[in-house]
From Swiss-Prot:
Name recorded for this polypeptide: Diphthine methyltransferase
Residue spans of the WD repeats: 194-232, 236-276, 422-464
Function: Catalyzes the demethylation of diphthine methyl ester to form diphthine, an intermediate diphthamide biosynthesis, a post-translational modification of histidine which occurs in translation elongation factor 2 (EEF2).
Name of encoding gene: Dph7
Keyword Hydrolase belongs to the record: yes
InterPro entries xref list: Diphthine_MTase, WD40/YVTN_repeat-like_dom_sf, WD40_repeat_CS, WD40_repeat_dom_sf, WD40_rpt
Root EC class: hydrolase
SMART domains named among the record's database cross-references: WD40
C-alpha cells in the first residue's frame, strides 16, 4: 500500500503480460469505458531466432491485450477478452469519439506503421479488435508515438479527424482519417529532430498546432499549415523530451516530461518560461491528465514508478506542483499509465496491499525474454531558450539513457471471452476540478512484464460535478 496526505493507493490486480509491457489505455468512449488495452514490446535476440546466414535482423515482438473491467469480480476485476500478436507496440491511443458508429484504437508499431483497429461487439457482450486500416510511414524506422486530434472528446464540426505520429528517425507524420471508411491518408512528413522523435501530440484546442519532443533535448511547436520552420523551440529540458500532453480541460496548458527527471508545466502563450518545474526522480515516459479533475496529472516515471501530481496551484497561483502520491517499483520500469474514465462504487473487499519493499506479485510461470541495452548517440543544438539545470542525482546522461531505454536497446546495432456487466457512473461529461473518493488507474511495467490495476482512495469529500446536476450517490446507469 502506498499512501500520502492525499489518500491511499491499493493494487486490485496484477496481470502477467508475458512480454514486456509499455503502453496501457482505458477506452474514453461512453458505453465502452470498462475496456482497457495493453500493448507490449519484446526484442528477440538472434540466439532466440538464429538466421542461417547470420544477417537476419532482430525481431521486435508485440502483443495487444484487451481487458474488460467488472467491479463485481472482486478477485480479478480485469478479464482478458482478446490477445493479438503483432509487431511490437510502442504507443496506442483510443479515438475519443466514435467514427461511423465504431470505436477505433490506433497503434504505433515497430514496423514503422500506424494501424487502426475497430472494436467489434459480438454475442454475449463479447468484444474483439479487428484491423481496419494501416499505413506504412517508413519501413526502416520505428513508429514511436501517436496522438488523435480528438483529445477534448468534442470538436468543432469543421475540424477533420487527424493523427500525428513520430518516429525513430526524428520525423513527424500528419495523417488524415477518412470518417466514412477509416482509411488513413498521409498529409505531410517532415524532419523535426536530429535523433529519435520520442513524442508527438496535438494542441487539443487548436489542432493545427502540434508539439514534438526529441532525443536532441528539444521541445518544439509546429503549425501544420506552414511546415518547414517550428513555431517555437525550447531547450528548458536538459535531456531527451519523451512525454507531452495538452490539457483537455484548460486551454493553453501543456505538460512535458523528460529523461532529465522533471515535469514542466507550460502556458503555451509564454513558452520561454514554464509555470512550474517538479523533479520526479525518474525519466518521464508518459503524462496523462485526469479525465474529470482538471488539475490532476499522472506521470509514468520509469525506474521511479509513477506519481500523481496536483497542478492546481501551479496553474492558478504560479506556485509549485504538489506530489500527492508516489509509488516506486524498484525491480522494473514503468512506461505505461492511464486514468480510467469510470467512477466505480466498489464495496470494501479483501485486497492485498502493494509493499514497496517486496514486489509480492506472483505472475504465471512464463519464460522472460531478455533484452540488452545500448545508449543512443546525442547532440546539442542552440535554441532561443536557456538550458535548465540537470537532474538532482549524479547520473550522467549516458548512464541514464543506458538504464532507461530498453525500447531502443538495439537501435544502433541494426541498419471469444465475454465481458462482465459493469456497474459504473460515466463521468465523461462531468466538470469541475475537485477530488473525489475513488479513482481507477492502470500502469504497466517493463522488465517484470506486469499490468497493474490500482484504486486511489482519497479522504476528501468535495463536490465533483459542479453545476452538472449529476448524482454520484448511485453508480447504476
Amino acid at each position: 500500500m502506498a499512501g500520502s496526505h492525499a489518500g491511499t493507493l491499493r493494487v486490485l490486480q496484477a496481470v502477467d503480460t508475458e512480454l514486456t509491457a509499455d503502453s496501457v489505455e482505458w477506452c474514453p468512449v461512453e458505453g465502452y469505458q470498462h475496456l482497457l488495452a495493453c500493448g507490449t514490446y519484446q526484442l528477440r535476440a538472434p540466439r532466440d531466432q538464429p538466421a542461417l546466414d547470420g544477417s537476419e535482423p532482430q525481431v521486435r515482438l508485440g502483443r495487444l491485450y484487451l481487458f474488460s473491467f467488472s467491479e463485481h469480480n472482486t478477485a480479478k476485476p480485469l478479464l482478458e477478452v482478446q490477445r493479438r500478436d503483432s509487431s511490437a507496440v510502442l504507443d496506442m491511443k483510443w479515438c475519443h469519439i466514435p467514427v461511423s458508429g465504431h470505436v477505433l484504437l490506433g497503434l504505433a508499431n515497430a514496423s514503422g506503421s500506424i494501424g487502426l483497429l475497430r472494436l467489434m461487439e459480438c454475442e454475449n457482450n463479447s468484444y474483439t479488435l479487428q484491423p481496419i486500416s494501416s499505413l506504412a510511414l517508413d519501413e526502416n524506422c520505428l513508429s514511436l508515438s501517436m496522438d488523435w486530434s480528438t483529445g477534448k472528446s468534442v470538436r468543432a464540426r469543421e475540424q477533420p479527424l487527424k493523427i500525428i505520429s513520430s518516429d525513430s528517425k526524428g520525423q513527424l507524420h500528419l495523417l488524415m482519417v477518412n470518417e466514412g471508411t477509416a482509411e488513413l491518408q498521409l498529409v505531410a512528413s517532415w524532419p523535426a529532430h536530429h535523433f529519435e522523435a520520442w513524442i508527438a501530440a496535438f494542441n487539443y484546442w487548436q489542432t493545427e498546432l502540434v508539439y514534438s519532443g526529441g532525443d536532441d533535448c528539444l521541445l518544439r511547436g509546429w503549425d501544420t499549415r506552414m511546415l518547414g520552420t517550428p513555431v517555437f523551440t525550447s531547450k528548458r529540458h536538459c535531456m531527451g523530451v519523451c512525454s507531452i500532453q495538452s490539457s483537455p480541460h484548460q486551454e493553453h496548458i501543456l505538460a512535458t516530461g523528460s529523461y532529465d527527471e522533471h515535469v514542466l508545466l507550460w502556458d503555451t502563450r509564454n513558452i520561454r518560461q514554464p509555470l512550474a518545474d517538479v523533479p520526479v526522480q525518474g525519466g518521464v515516459w508518459r503524462l496523462k491528465w485526469h479525465p474529470v479533475h482538471h488539475h490532476l496529472l499522472l506521470a509514468a516515471c520509469m525506474h521511479n514508478g509513477f506519481k500523481i501530481l496536483n497542478c492546481q496551484k501551479a496553474i492558478e497561483e504560479k506556485q509549485d506542483i504538489t506530489v500527492l502520491t508516489s509509488h516506486e517499483m524498484p525491480n522494473s520500469l514503468v512506461y505505461g499509465a492511464d486514468w480510467s474514465w469510470l467512477f466505480h462504487s466498489m464495496k470494501p473487499t479483501p485486497t492485498w496491499f502493494f509493499d514497496q519493499n517486496d514486489m509480492g506479485v506472483k505472475a504465471a510461470d512464463h519464460s522472460s525474454l531478455k533484452v540488452t541495452e545500448e545508449p543512443p548517440i546525442h547532440s546539442q543544438e542552440q535554441t532561443m531558450d536557456r538550458q535548465v539545470e540537470g537532474p538532482a542525482n549524479a547520473h550522467t546522461r549516458a548512464e541514464l539513457k543506458a538504464s532507461l531505454l530498453p525500447l531502443t536497446e538495439d537501435m544502433k546495432n541494426s541498419k471469444d471471452c465475454s465481458s462482465s456487466s459493469v456497474k459504473t457512473r460515466d463521468l465523461s461529461h462531468c466538470s469541475g476540478g475537485q477530488s473525489f473518493d475513488n479513482s481507477l488507474l492502470a500502469t504497466c511495467s517493463f522488465y517484470d512484464h506486469v499490468l497493474h490495476l490500482w484504486k486511489w482512495e482519497t479522504n476528501q469529500a468535495r463536490t465533483l460535478c459542479s453545476g452538472t446536476g449529476c448524482d454520484l450517490g448511485s453508480a447504476d446507469h
